């Protein structure tokens, strides 16, 4: 019997994501939709499938994990290429169970106890070489699927021995999009710093620029203070000092598309006269909220009806083929100086230098503390509405009642 909506403060709610096949033969349950890449290891996908034996009628039930790269232009098929490439596929049979049963995770223990004897656990792991979820933001008027890397978990019942995609009854299958999200390594690199000097015509001494950050890794939503020192030994005036956060996205699969997009900008009000020095700190805050309408910005992947953020910096692990990563994302601070010329604005020149840094998610405080046994499990059901393509529109619907017994 379901408990009332009141829950103890000492027993936190934990959302369980649930989706039912059209014929109600299989139901999949996941405890997360974001799975963390800790650099040294990746959080596995653990969940359960609830099977209705009367509806399955002797079929086998499988769960699959697929990682795919989409180029984003479905008409590319015209020139002999496919617009999608599967980077990884794995499949496990959950019903009838095969082989020795593995020890269930804490989440699975709670769900097995809650859902009864027709519930079967599964565990899917990410190989070390897979990329994290990433997509290039489409323009508001764009239609179709976005360019990027996505992950999908699928459960289905079939009587086919090879379980090929075209032989799976769609009414007996259910799928959920998930994300693989990069979190920062525990150790930071050296403090970023860059220096540059330029010699101008008719000036004996150079213009010198130094740019530094106070650390190498910044977290999403964290302000970035940029210290700029301009030493102007020339006879010219530095009229403008601008600092940018630039996102660099390199599509390395199918093509070599290269996107450099400014995602934050600040300008100093001061000028630097001849034979003087200025030190100034400009604070930048790169946020998706300020870039939502801009086509080609790389995001951390997006699940329908849920928000996301700017893409995290790509970590290329040793020995991994970089082309398999699909889209490589990096960030840099660019400081640009506008220097006066002999004829004023008409002959002014611009010089710039860049400092790389990484933008990432912080590591969780202590993932080992997470426990489901004392939590109130709240089911969030994803129903089908207005299916327009094979992607299946998803809409979250939180159950009103807790299911803690």
From Swiss-Prot:
Tissue expression per record: Detected in retina, in the proximal portion of the outer segment of rod photoreceptor cells (at protein level).
Keyword Membrane listed: yes
Subcellular location: Cell projection, Cilium, Photoreceptor outer segment; Membrane
Bilayer topology annotation: Peripheral membrane protein
Modified residues (Phosphothreonine): 234
Cysteine pairs bridged by disulfides in the record: none
CC per GO annotation: cytosol; membrane; photoreceptor inner segment; photoreceptor outer segment
SUPFAM superfamilies linked to this entry: E set domains
MF-aspect GO terms: G protein-coupled receptor binding; opsin binding; phosphoprotein binding; protein phosphatase inhibitor activity; spectrin binding
Alphabetical GO biological process terms: cell surface receptor signaling pathway; G protein-coupled opsin signaling pathway; G protein-coupled receptor internalization
The organism's place on the tree of life at top rank: Eukaryota
Main location: other
Alphabetized UniProt keyword annotations: Cell projection, Congenital stationary night blindness, Disease variant, Membrane, Phosphoprotein, Retinitis pigmentosa
Record comment regarding domains: The C-terminus interferes with binding to non-phosphorylated RHO. Interaction with phosphorylated RHO triggers displacement of the C-terminus and leads to a conformation change that mediates high-affinity RHO binding.
Quaternary structure and partners: Monomer. Homodimer. Homotetramer. Interacts with RHO (via the phosphorylated C-terminus).
Family: Belongs to the arrestin family.
Cited function: Binds to photoactivated, phosphorylated RHO and terminates RHO signaling via G-proteins by competing with G-proteins for the same binding site on RHO. May play a role in preventing light-dependent degeneration of retinal photoreceptor cells.
Disease implication from the record: Night blindness, congenital stationary, Oguchi type 1: A non-progressive retinal disorder characterized by impaired night vision, often associated with nystagmus and myopia. Congenital stationary night blindness Oguchi type is an autosomal recessive form associated with fundus discoloration and abnormally slow dark adaptation. Retinitis pigmentosa 47: A retinal dystrophy belonging to the group of pigmentary retinopathies. Retinitis pigmentosa is characterized by retinal pigment deposits visible on fundus examination and primary loss of rod photoreceptor cells followed by secondary loss of cone photoreceptors. Patients typically have night vision blindness and loss of midperipheral visual field. As their condition progresses, they lose their far peripheral visual field and eventually central vision as well.
Protein name: S-arrestin
Organism, scientific name: Homo sapiens (Human)
